[in-house]
């Protein structure tokens, strides 16, 4: 059920973002919904962690998501001021997205591995 809700929220946020202006409130809400729906999609793995661990993981996820969002908005403003080809800007932003998401996933994997419960119910 959480996978269905996560996928529905993901597509809904993409549709709202595509039809809203960049700095509008609906665009910001849709961006937040995007990250929340990704978290809901991965909620099936929550039984492997204690409540305190889930709080740490969720806070880390939202901080990293906010950091990636701010990094992308900063880079788009920076690239708009530089007079270079649109294709180069597009490739640089795609590279920035892939790199920052890969780093965020590595950080989340490291934190999740450290906080996972042992078979006896205690955390590592």
From Swiss-Prot:
<feature type="transmembrane region" description="Helical">
    <location>
        <begin position="54"/>
        <end position="74"/>
    </location>
</feature>
<feature type="transmembrane region" description="Helical">
    <location>
        <begin position="88"/>
        <end position="108"/>
    </location>
</feature>
<dbReference type="InterPro" id="IPR025621">
    <property type="entry name" value="YoqO"/>
</dbReference>
<keyword id="KW-1003">Cell membrane</keyword>
<keyword id="KW-0812">Transmembrane</keyword>
<keyword id="KW-0472">Membrane</keyword>
<protein>
    <recommendedName>
        <fullName>SPbeta prophage-derived uncharacterized protein YoqO</fullName>
    </recommendedName>
</protein>
<keyword id="KW-1133">Transmembrane helix</keyword>
<dbReference type="Pfam" id="PF14037">
    <property type="entry name" value="YoqO"/>
</dbReference>
<dbReference type="GO" id="GO:0005886">
    <property type="term" value="C:plasma membrane"/>
</dbReference>
């Amino acid at each position: 059920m959480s996978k269905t809700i996560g996928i529905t929220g993901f597509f809904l946020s993409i549709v709202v973002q595509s039809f809203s202006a960049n700095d509008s409130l609906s665009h910001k809400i849709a961006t937040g919904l995007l990250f929340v729906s990704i978290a809901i999609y991965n909620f099936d793995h929550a039984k492997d962690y204690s409540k305190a661990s889930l709080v740490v993981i969720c806070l880390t996820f939202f901080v990293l998501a906010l950091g990636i969002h701010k990094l992308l908005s900063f880079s788009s403003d920076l690239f708009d001021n530089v007079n270079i080809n649109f294709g180069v800007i597009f490739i640089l932003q795609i590279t920035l997205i892939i790199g920052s998401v890969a780093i965020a996933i590595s950080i989340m994997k490291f934190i999740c591995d450290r906080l996972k419960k042992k078979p006896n119910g205690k955390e590592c």
